[in-house]
Amino acid sequence: MIKIAINGYGRIGRNVLRALYESGRDKNIKIVAINELAAPEAMVHLTRFDTSHGRFHHPVQLAGNSMLVGEDLISLFAERDPSRLPWRALGVDVVLDCTGVFGSRADAELHLAAGAGKVLFSHPAEADVDATIVYGVNHQVLTGRERIVSNASCTTNCVVPVIETLHREFEINCGTITTIHSAMHDQQVIDAYHSDLRRTRAASQSIIPVDTKLAKGLERILPHFAGKFEAIAVRVPTINVTAMDLSITVRKKVTVTDVNQALQRASRGTLSGILDYTEEPLVSVDFNHDAHSCIIDGTQTRVSDANLVKMLMWCDNEWGFANRMLDTTRAMMAAG
């Protein structure tokens, strides 16, 4: 039995819990605790009802200082200092740190000092962590000795399997990526102050360029592409699902059919459950609650002069990533 604790019960933290239960309940994983500074009543309410993902089809209620999900009692804490949490007493194997705030080795060591066996960040971390994992691409590097791991980002999990597949088939020279991301909690409902002047503007009224470290994150997973990719990102007025526009140049001459068939083969083979492929005339909302890391829209693949390839891919930046958090947790524990 893998005992996990969730530190930070926001969009990803709640989706991790929902994904664990909705997937038929992996009997080998149990959530034993949640640490969140919000009111317990609000935590229960947002577990039961979700604007993006609908109602949670398991009974949830408060039970003293715990949350009862079905027959499972999950201890609730509101502690700012992770080193003071009772991870040792609870026998926590892995802390899923979903705060979006912590991200260094020193941050993770606070959980380890409290008695946790390992820590998995739900976001890109500093370079001093033991490993950064994109499940399906490099989770095999886990040896069991890693105690502090990052699950990268939702966009890295979306684009890296595609880049790795196409590089293996056609030898990529370089590329650019545009992320078209749904609005996030760090944006404003109406114009208000923010250190990023673009994010002072109302999220529902504009397409908003934001900074992204996606290219650096990609290099950490695929170091042979250091300096070969650049990325930009915009936020759009939707609440979930992200599109990614990938352009690459390749050494081998290719056609649209070549590219699409390579991705279809990968989706049926080594990347089954991670990568999906469609040619249906779908829009972003159709990918809401899709557990894949990436869904290729084959109708949008373009090739210019046999070497310049452009394609469109989708991901549910919440649900898909939450499922990868669970996959990486299993891989960390299976490695030893």
UniProtKB/Swiss-Prot annotation:
Gene3D superfamilies the record matches: Dihydrodipicolinate Reductase, domain 2, NAD(P)-binding Rossmann-like Domain
- Asked if Ion transport is a keyword of the record, the answer is no
Chain positions of site Activates thiol group during catalysis:
H181
Residues at which NAD(+) binds = R11, I12, R80, N317
A biological process (GO) of this protein is: pyridoxine biosynthetic process
Q: What is the protein's quaternary organization?
A: Homotetramer.
Family named by the database record: Belongs to the glyceraldehyde-3-phosphate dehydrogenase family. Epd subfamily.
What name has this protein been given in UniProt?
Answer: D-erythrose-4-phosphate dehydrogenase
**In which organism is this protein found?**
Aeromonas hydrophila subsp. hydrophila (strain ATCC 7966 / DSM 30187 / BCRC 13018 / CCUG 14551 / JCM 1027 / KCTC 2358 / NCIMB 9240 / NCTC 8049)
